Amino acid sequence: MTSDLSPSRGAAPHAAPLGAVARVEEAQLLEAALLSGAHVLLEGPPGTGKSTLLRQVAHNREIPFVLVEGNAELTPARLIGHFDPALVLERGYAAEIFEDGPLLEAMRTGGLLYVEELNRIPEETLNVLLAAMSEKEIAVPRLGRVVAASGFGLVAAMNPFDAVGTARVSSALYDRTCRISMGYQSAAAERDIVTLHSPDIDDAWRAKVVALVRASREHDALEWGSAVRGAIDIARIAVELAQLRGVAVDDWHVGLAAAEVSLSGRIRLHDSTGRSPEDVVREMYERIFGPEPTDDSADDADSAGSPGEP
């Protein structure tokens, strides 16, 4: 890749400012790697801003951006493209009836191919990517040789800690990429991220929501916890649920309900735990937000907030 990153069709959409998600250094490293012609592997758990990082870099430099989700169904044909079967019967294997897949679209436009969940891709599909990365060209049967336009690059992302439905990434791929490790952001950065999505909620309550999500990453019963997306959803759901119930956003029961629905599917329990996700979420919630208020404590709070009888 050269430093010619001129705009073309399919420019990346706008994303959150990188300063707001504490990824300025990673953005500089990614941009420098792409400008140098290197391909990049972003490694980190879900919700650490890998997609946001790439989208913002691509948006800022107006680089064409093609997204493909890695999974077991991503065959070489789906990645490269195919001839339209109906038109083949009429016109034969003419180049103009070939429908580009995401790889050829990125190569022809000199854009970035962003591959999510790289370690879920079948080996034969991964070999196609390796060839395109190494040679900046591929040979397509009945279509011929496709050479990548200036600016083409591949950025892949994966969660190296997820062992379910994934395969070990070969050393050949690591040898062809520069690796940027992306861990969880600081508590302050995560509070800023939640603020972007729910700016009107109380700062102290928002801080507790972030503390709850961060606690899930260290709980002994959990194999892994939630990323900041869980905190974003807790805040959003609590706002709507409080309106439906006619109570304050920081109502204890509203917060618990929002936390259970937002986190129970994001956390993963150890097989030997013998507990439900909701049970663990409630335990953490009570530790951060305090025990469930009783009717007496609610009455005391109401009395404290009202003038007494003379």
Identify the function of each model-found stretch.
Residues G19, L118, D220-A227, T273:
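Generic alpha-helical structural element
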Residues A86, A238-L241, V261-R266:
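Phosphate/oxyanion-binding loops and surfaces in catalytic or ligand/nucleic-acid-binding neighborhoods
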Residues A248-P310:
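C-terminal engagement/docking regions of AAA+ P-loop ATPases
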